[in-house]
């Protein structure tokens, strides 16, 4: 039947895990009106990460100026202006949560002259001022390839600079039409070559790519100097999003991990539920 969604296999039936920290974080985020990608992107690891006392903060609101067909975050051409108090609120939440490692990400803000880069730097500075011992990973957008905006963020020297290629180049037109595969690779190369940053990227599988295409993209990432990799199963957020072509079995994720480690990636997280920030900081 056209439009029929695939039935999830047994290995994708996640057992909910919650601890006392889960409720504490939920209350804190509600009280401070902060956004997390955990909730906005419907991450399957939300319960696990929150129960471990970690979260990924979503900067610049929860509405994106782009409409990637895989993403659950809402889209709008002219979102509300950035909240100038958000950097301080996030820094306060990091302190209250006693985080040892912080992950920051953001929506695309193509409506802003700098894509939100200054807001990024203000948030990073605020966190480092209030929690100087906390590690910091930044999962950045492409800033439309604006070198000045990219350098503004990279000059703050996060411990890890993460930028996802998301999928193989053949699928970009249908999955990520407002982005460029080669531009994403150049961002990772810039972070390492010009700034000496540890770089990381992530891919989703199950969208129609072949095993060989994923391996080829891994090679592209290594050529760009990327040393850390995440690979996870694409899960269709709603019926209107890009359909799942297939559910990749666990043993295929193991094969991806072996291929990546053989290429020289220092850290590889590969599995059905893996997402960009899954176990972030565990390799630090």
From Swiss-Prot:
Recorded GO molecular functions are: 4 iron, 4 sulfur cluster binding; lipoate synthase activity; metal ion binding
Q: Which InterPro entries match?
A: Aldolase_TIM, Elp3/MiaA/NifB-like_rSAM, Lipoyl_synth, rSAM
Q: Could you name the Gene Ontology cellular component terms for this entry?
A: cytoplasm
SMART domains, alphabetically? Elp3
The EC number(s) given in the record are 2.8.1.8
Q: Which residues bind [4Fe-4S] cluster 2?
A: 64, 68, 71
Cofactor binding notes: Binds 2 [4Fe-4S] clusters per subunit. One cluster is coordinated with 3 cysteines and an exchangeable S-adenosyl-L-methionine.
Q: Do the record's keywords include Membrane?
A: no
Q: What are its cofactors?
A: [4Fe-4S] cluster
Q: Where is the Radical SAM core domain?
A: 50-266
Record-linked Pfam families: Radical_SAM (PF04055)
Record's subcellular location: Cytoplasm
- Does the record's keyword annotation contain Membrane? no
Q: What class of enzyme is it?
A: transferase
Q: Which reaction does it catalyse?
A: [[Fe-S] cluster scaffold protein carrying a second [4Fe-4S](2+) cluster] + N(6)-octanoyl-L-lysyl-[protein] + 2 oxidized [2Fe-2S]-[ferredoxin] + 2 S-adenosyl-L-methionine + 4 H(+) = [[Fe-S] cluster scaffold protein] + N(6)-[(R)-dihydrolipoyl]-L-lysyl-[protein] + 4 Fe(3+) + 2 hydrogen sulfide + 2 5'-deoxyadenosine + 2 L-methionine + 2 reduced [2Fe-2S]-[ferredoxin]
* UniProt keyword list: 4Fe-4S, Cytoplasm, Iron, Iron-sulfur, Metal-binding, S-adenosyl-L-methionine, Transferase
Give the PANTHER family listed for this entry: LIPOYL SYNTHASE, LIPOYL SYNTHASE, MITOCHONDRIAL
Write out the similarity annotation: Belongs to the radical SAM superfamily. Lipoyl synthase family.
Question: NCBIfam families, per this entry?
Answer: lipA, PRK05481.1, PRK12928.1
Question: Know the name of this protein?
Answer: Lipoyl synthase
Give the organism, scientific name. Chlorobium phaeovibrioides (strain DSM 265 / 1930)
